Structure formats: structure tokens, C-alpha cells
Amino acid sequence: IAGYMHDIGNAINRTHHAEYGGLLADGILKKTDMNIKDRITIVSAISNHDESTGGAVDLVSAALIIADKTDVRRDRVRSEKGKAAFDIHDRVNYAVTQHKLKVNVDKKTISLNLQIDTKICSMYEYFEIFLGRMMMCRGAADMLGATFKLMANGSKVL
């Protein structure tokens, strides 16, 4: 449920969308027969999933953070904008030509492997936008008792 609702706050504003999302989700979930403990877990995960204000506070928030922050790929970009209208976030996502997230339960690793077209976006630009997100994934993996690994264009980064 947290994963499904986590970006609902964008309906109000991109800035502080996690906090707005927590408030909106709480209002919606109050109308269900969900018990308070589960509702708090979901609202907390939504409220803490943004790198500017949040972090992993429990297993659910850790899983949400990893799922959200590792979702970097070309098809996230709406192509009708045209490349000339891409901002840096669009360009970074568009530059990712391959992505693979792998969880190895036995080795307790969560690995993200990206292939980035450096003709579209430099590695510097990628890390300017995504380093904080990848560090947040590392903290979330720690919360899950795992190690987060990042490979970009065949090179180990984290």
C-alpha cells in the first residue's frame, strides 16, 4: 500500500511531496478498517521516502526507499516533451539504457546495475542528481540487514 500511494503528495506539490503524501494517505486510510499500527507504518513510510527530509525508519520504509530510489530508467521520461525540454532529471533518467535491481537473499546484497549513455548525460550529472538517493538506498539496505551495491557502466560505485 505504501508503494502504491507513496507519490500521492505530488498532487499538491513536488516540494515536500512525501509529507503531503503522508497526510493525504492518512486521511484516505482512516476511512478503511485498517488497524492504527498498520496505518502508522504506511503513513510513516510515505512521509519518510524523500531524500531531502526522510530516511528509513523501519523495514517497510526501507523497502519503499529502495524501490523508489532505484527506479531510474528511460521509460520514466514522457517522450512527448521532446529532448529539448528535458530538465536534468529527465536527461539522467533518459540516459539510463539498461537497469537491473537484484536482491541476493543468501549474500544479503541489493545490487543496482545501470548502463548510462554518457552522450546524453555525463556521469557527473548522474551523481549530481542521484548520489543522495543512492546513499539513502545504502542506509535503507542497512536497515534491512543487507549491503547496497551500485554498478554504473561496469564500474563499482558503492
Which sequence ranges carry the predicted segments?
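Terminal helices and disordered tails flanking the catalytic cores of nucleotide-processing hydrolases
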Residues: R74-L158
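Divalent metal-dependent catalytic cores for phosphoryl transfer on phosphate-bearing substrates
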Residues: I1-V103
